[in-house]
Amino acid sequence: MAILTVSNGQSIQDAINAAAPGDTIDVQAGTYTDQFLTIRASITLQAVGGEVLLRETISPPDGKAMVTEGASGISVAINGFDISGVAVPDGNGAAIRYEGGSLTLSDDYFHDNQEGLLGAADPGGSISIDHSEFASNGDGSGSTHNIYVGAIAGFTLTNSYIHDAVVGHEVKSRAANNTITGNRIFDNGGSASYSIDLPNGGNATISGNTIEQGPNTQNPFIVAYGEEGASNAGTSFTITGNTIVNDDASGRFLLDPATQPTLSGNSVWGLPATGDTVLLASRPSLDTSSLSFISNPGGDPPPAPPPVSEPPPAPPPPEPPPLPPPEPPPLPPPPEPPPVPPPVQHGHMGH
């Protein structure tokens, strides 16, 4: 697998055309104008050294998007791109148009387009979005959205900031399996319809999000499930651990004609209690000025991890116990006693 590099002013599409499946294309920071990209092979496209801004001054030649991606069976990753201003005559100009395979988006910022992400159907396909921002997308007609996902196998949205769609939905997915976790989904300044719309049902988990429905919403329901007919096979639907704020006088939490969801551990403000919910006594502060949970919105390279600290030195070995004192030298043997003199012999004296 090779790494190809595109410098500011060079053609990104030329690098895509030259890449083999599995290659990575490093795009240097800068503004790339009217570079409309088509990706039909398994590659990774990533920003290096700062933000990569894709801007248009003319309508996309294919009438679709700034980036058109997809073919059945391919895997594409796009990391660190900022795309805005895409418009086409039919009103569906998207930052990125998905047409099949597996698509992974991370650290991207798609804003002020007619569509943020527009996804076609692929029964075996998947889309995963992490640490990204979708803002103020939509053409005002009501049929465009911040995120639209067609009939695919799986859709995952995590740790992202989705807000202020222009009339359409913040997130709409027809995927058979949906996981929407750890996001901020707000409509404080826009006129969106549903915050989350899963029109064909399926298996879905909505957990750990902060969701706000603004006062100018076009639809009172915050979450909708199966409203267009539960054509997807699964019916497991869980909503847990979310903070949900309603600023609309007629707002409602859930439109769900298709199944009985599992509701647990949600905190709500401006809504009646539904299931296992906690009513908040006051409106929570929903400050979005510091989105620290998005590691690098718009493509800034993530900070390097802190250096691994050196392990502390091993303690010195314990001192050995003192040696016992040496044995004293043996005492010299006592002196031999002097020899006993032999007895004196006396002669026999006669008379």
Predicted features and spans:
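RTX-like calcium-binding, glycine/aspartate-rich low-complexity repeat tracts
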Residues: 1-3, 292-351
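Extracellular beta-strand/beta-solenoid scaffold signature
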Residues: 58-69, 89-97, 112-121, 140-151, ...
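Extracellular beta-strand-rich solenoid/capping regions of secreted or surface-exposed proteins
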Residues: 13, 17-20, 32-46, 53-79, ...
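Right-handed parallel beta-helix/beta-solenoid
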Residues: 1-18, 29-31
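Extracellular, surface-exposed repeat architectures
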Residues: 60-61, 69, 229-230, 275, ...
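Extracellular beta-strand repeat scaffolds in secreted/surface proteins
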Residues: 23-27, 209-211
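Active-site and glycan-interaction determinants of carbohydrate-active enzymes
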Residues: 270-280
